[in-house]
């Protein structure tokens, strides 16, 4: 895959770091790519992904949400849409990227990933060139959020290595805490060729103090045993509004915008916007890094 990544630099024109002009052009509009992951299923990761996407859109951002969970893809259920096409149609040259993007009633665009990302590594040069050019058309978005699979399966590490920021979602449950530490350990020991901008989000808390306490426990353990810095981005309350929105197949940011979970999501997105992220590298570099992830 590293050879593919090198070839991709030529295809997308990203192989000239000394070219100041190209650097300046990329900074004029650089898409921010956020991967949202978790150590285990059932912690509300997909709900967080969907509602964060909507919160960014409500700030006036152009947002694309990609379902990168290759095993249990269900973003479309929360958005109440039925995608007829996915990334595999682009890879097979049956559709363009523009043709598979779904507009939603919530102000965000959606791409069904299916198992498309898992097929990229096996593409021929010609196929990769076509897909790379199609994928680069997503560069007009301000934010791309990728809802990854849970745990380490299904290309999760590739998404994490390629994203500008990575949100690890956990809950106060002991198993979720243990699994959150586990996925952080794997991320920090397997991805060795670049820093990973990790942020911790504690979902389904009953108080702000509980969220802070859980985050401090994980952050302290990560620092002590892994020597890695991870930031606490915030918490989301346990609330009946979340389940009610799932039943209605509408995001809680839409169904109940003044609920506690909605307020929490707005605060998290606001805090993220004010933070100083690592330089966003855009969609072209995302694909190059996705193909060229190095591990121990």
Descriptions of predicted regions:
Residues 1-39:
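Extreme N-terminal, non-catalytic leader segments
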Residues 33-97:
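Walker A/P-loop NTP-binding active-site region of P-loop NTPases
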Residues 68-142, 192, 247:
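P-loop/Walker-type NTP enzyme "switch/lid" segment
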Residues 133-135, 177-194:
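Conserved C-terminal guanine-recognition region of P-loop GTPase G domains, centered on the G4
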Residues 134-139, 153-175:
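Inter-motif core of Ras-like GTPase G domains
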Residues 171-172, 198-212, 235-242, 257:
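G-domain G4 guanine-recognition motif of GTPases
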Residues 224-253, 264-267:
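Beta-strand-loop-alpha "switch" segments that mediate conformational coupling across diverse proteins
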Residues 250-296:
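NTP-binding/hydrolysis catalytic cores, primarily Walker-type P-loop NTPases
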């Amino acid at each position: 895959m590293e050879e593919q990544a090198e070839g991709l630099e030529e295809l997308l024109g990203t192989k000239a770091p000394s070219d100041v002009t190209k650097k300046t052009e990329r900074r004029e509009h650089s898409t921010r790519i956020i991967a949202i992951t978790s150590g285990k299923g059932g912690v509300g990761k997909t709900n967080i992904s969907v509602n964060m996407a909507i919160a960014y859109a409500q700030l006036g951002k152009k947002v694309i949400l990609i379902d990168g969970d290759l095993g249990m893809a269900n973003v479309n259920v929360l958005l109440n849409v039925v995608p007829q096409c996915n990334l595999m149609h682009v890879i097979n040259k049956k559709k363009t990227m523009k043709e598979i993007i779904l507009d939603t009633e919530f102000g965000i665009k959606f791409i069904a990933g299916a198992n498309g990302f898992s097929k990229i590594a096996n593409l021929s040069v010609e196929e990769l060139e076509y897909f790379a050019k199609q994928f680069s058309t997503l560069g007009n978005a301000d934010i791309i959020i990728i809802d990854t699979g849970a745990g380490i399966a299904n290309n999760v590490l590739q998404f994490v290595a390629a994203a500008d920021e990575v949100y690890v979602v956990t809950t106060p449950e002991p198993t979720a805490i243990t699994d959150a530490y586990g996925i952080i350990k794997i991320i920090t020991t397997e991805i060795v060729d670049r820093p990973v901008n990790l942020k911790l989000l504690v979902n389904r808390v009953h108080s702000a103090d509980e969220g802070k306490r859980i985050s401090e426990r994980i952050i302290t353990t990560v620092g002590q045993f892994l020597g890695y810095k991870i930031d606490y981005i915030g918490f989301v309350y346990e609330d009946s509004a979340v389940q009610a929105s799932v039943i209605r197949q509408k995001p809680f940011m839409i169904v109940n915008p003044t609920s506690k979970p909605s307020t929490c999501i707005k605060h998290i997105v606001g805090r993220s916007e004010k933070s100083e992220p690592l330089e966003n590298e855009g969609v072209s570099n995302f694909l190059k890094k996705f193909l060229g992830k190095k591990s121990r």
